[in-house]
Regions:
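Non-catalytic, usually N-terminal nucleic-acid engagement modules in DNA/RNA processing proteins
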Residues: 1-108
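Catalytic cores of enzyme domains
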Residues: 100-184
Length: 184
């Protein structure tokens, strides 16, 4: 399995997965039923032993609780990072109000996160089906998410940060709001 195979699998999932469309049952308004949430993703691939991952254990980055790729899976060689850009409909809708998020963006945040989880599980299974070892940290029983209460700012954190991993893999950089900025 190569990078083009992974991109093809992602493209098919984006187009055909019901998770990428707002269902009638979940739609906040009738007009949003059937709205597509994401476009095709962009990918970056990093070496599991990249020194950048070790730097994420620093308190100024993620923290000591961050698990390195080889702590998740000892045989890890490659880390796959991806970013799903919102559709124009989701992006443009959030320009309507400077205070409240749009309904479209709320669907992107909630149903969109569910889509990303399902995609991670799907891609992981495809890689395994091809005979490779694979693990999706956010779907692993060891994945932890929460607030660190023993620091001054009560940071919300996890032991695998997709946006920090994206940075190490070369997918993007950080903005002022700590979100990842990519080419798309």
């Amino acid at each position: 399995m190569n990078k083009l195979d992974i991109a093809r699998i992602a493209q098919e999932f984006v187009l055909n997965s019901d998770y990428n469309y707002v269902s009638k049952e979940n739609a906040l308004t009738e007009e949003l039923a059937g709205m597509k949430i994401f476009e095709e993703p962009i990918f970056a691939f990093g070496a599991a032993d990249d020194e950048g991952f070790q730097l994420l254990k620093n308190p100024q980055a993620v923290g000591e609780h961050f698990l390195l790729p080889k702590e998740w899976m000892l045989s890890a060689n490659t880390v796959i990072s991806f970013f799903f850009p919102f559709t124009d409909e989701v992006i443009k809708s959030n320009r309507k109000d400077n205070y409240w998020p749009s309904d479209e963006w709320l669907h992107g945040r909630i149903e969109g996160q569910n889509f990303i989880k399902e995609f991670s599980i799907f891609l992981n299974s495809k890689i395994i089906d091809e005979g490779y070892e694979s693990l999706a940290p956010t779907s692993d029983a060891r994945f932890r998410l929460g607030c660190i209460r023993d620091n001054e700012i009560n940071d919300f954190t996890s032991n695998w940060s997709e946006r920090h991993v994206a940075y190490v893999c070369g997918l993007g950089t950080f903005g002022l709001s700590k979100g990842i900025i990519t080419e798309r």
